[in-house]
Amino acid sequence: MEYLKFVLYGLIQGLTEFIPVSSTAHLKVISLFLGIDDPGASLSATIQLGSVIAIAYYFRNDIFNFRSQSSKKFLEYLFHERLLRSIFIGTIPIVLLGGSIKIFIPSFFENVLRSNLSIALVSFLMAFFMYLADSSKRGSINIKNHNFSNSFLIGIFQAFAIFPGVSRSGVTISSALISGWERGDAAKFSFLLGMPAISLAAIVEFVSSFNDFFSLGFFPLFVGLITTFLSSLLAIDFLLKYFSSNGLKIFIIYRVIFGVVILLNL
């Protein structure tokens, strides 16, 4: 039964990290509704790592698209590669905002912004923002022709995903659509942009709960990691195909229902 809990956490993380509904909110709320423990920082860090590995594996040709070259040329290639530079630029805002919160308002963040009421209200706000994105005119910006200001703008919106209930994929895909991206590439760039952001979040969780790793044990964490990895791959593959010809409507409706359910159970 204990291992089923880790499988559940892995499924929730893997699916909701990429489906625009907020993984943090679902991990917290579903744990509360089912009467099971909050996954905690150590488990959260491990299962987030599963999502990062899934992104790296799924997009391995985009990230490591090189033929046999010397190490020096490969490093030069990485440094000058447009996509990787865009991801780096888009990650800057969330690093600055996340660091500021950790330094200046850590208690307010944990006690107020992570409350169920806050998550419900944020879910409604995100539903409205996603509606604006879904209603916007289809654009022509894509992975190949975007510029660094495009990636930085999306990165600014990604920074708000620090707040529970926002959904990193939801806010980045929506902001990309509003700023003129094609649907399929908006989702693809969102997932790629998530690699450093999710990795940094996992590192912060790991550092803050290092001792807890030893109490949980290796095998339960491994179960959570593998479950997250597999469910993340399924979510990425499904959503890239889905967004190539569909909008955000179904997720907008879900976010409204999710917010209402939380409010009714306060």
Curated annotation (Swiss-Prot):
The record's EC number reads 3.6.1.27
Topology in the lipid bilayer is annotated as:
Multi-pass membrane protein
Its subcellular locations are:
Cell inner membrane
Membrane-crossing ranges are 39-59, 86-106, 112-132, 147-167, 189-209, 216-236, 246-266
Principal cellular location given in the protein's record: membrane
Recorded GO CC terms = plasma membrane
Biological-process GO terms, alphabetical: cell wall organization; peptidoglycan biosynthetic process; regulation of cell shape; response to antibiotic
Q: Which GO terms describe its molecular function?
A: undecaprenyl-diphosphatase activity
What catalytic activity is recorded?
di-trans,octa-cis-undecaprenyl diphosphate + H2O = di-trans,octa-cis-undecaprenyl phosphate + phosphate + H(+)
Extract the InterPro entries matched here: UppP
Ordered alphabetically, the record's keywords are: Antibiotic resistance, Cell inner membrane, Cell membrane, Cell shape, Cell wall biogenesis/degradation, Hydrolase, Membrane, Peptidoglycan synthesis, Transmembrane, Transmembrane helix
Return the similarity comment.
Answer: Belongs to the UppP family.
Function recorded in the entry = Catalyzes the dephosphorylation of undecaprenyl diphosphate (UPP). Confers resistance to bacitracin.
A further note on this protein reads: Bacitracin is thought to be involved in the inhibition of peptidoglycan synthesis by sequestering undecaprenyl diphosphate, thereby reducing the pool of lipid carrier available.
The record's section on PANTHER family has: UNDECAPRENYL-DIPHOSPHATASE (PTHR30622:SF4)
Indicate what this protein is called per its UniProt record: Undecaprenyl-diphosphatase
Task: Look up and give the organism this protein is from.
Answer: Prochlorococcus marinus (strain MIT 9301)
The organism's taxonomy opens as: Bacteria, Bacillati, Cyanobacteriota, Cyanophyceae, Synechococcales
